[in-house]
A protein has these predicted regions:
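Thiotemplate assembly-line natural product biosynthesis machinery
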Residues: 1-20, 71-83
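Residue-level recognition of oxygen-bearing side chains
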Residues: 6, 26, 68
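Phosphopantetheine carrier-protein modules
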Residues: 12-32, 50-59, 83
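Catalytic nucleophile serine of serine hydrolases
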Residues: 35
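Conserved catalytic core of two-component sensor histidine kinases
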Residues: 39
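AMP-binding/adenylate-forming catalytic domain of the ANL superfamily
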Residues: 56-68
């Protein structure tokens, strides 16, 4: 599975929905995420991609869509490799 597929699988699992969201769709507006699910999802992302997303970065806009989540994960993966 590529990065986007892994992220999508996490979002679907956390949301308990049966369908996958469109990569640009608002996960909050579509009911995939709320503030409680966001923290669970971030924890899953950190485990899956072996990254650490600081609490100060937990702005819902960073996690608005699959595409935005992919950008955020890539940012922290690049930072982990640079260390």
């Amino acid at each position: 599975m590529n990065k986007r597929e892994r992220i999508t699988a996490i979002v679907v699992r956390i949301s308990n929905k049966r369908t996958e969201p469109d990569p640009e769709e608002s996960l909050f507006d579509a009911g995939y995420l709320d503030s409680f699910a966001l923290t669970d999802m971030v924890s899953e992302l950190e485990k899956e991609f072996q990254i650490r997303i600081p609490d100060s970065e937990l702005n819902p806009r960073r996690f608005e869509s699959i595409a935005r989540i992919e950008e955020t994960v890539a940012k922290y993966m690049a930072g982990a490799h640079a260390a």
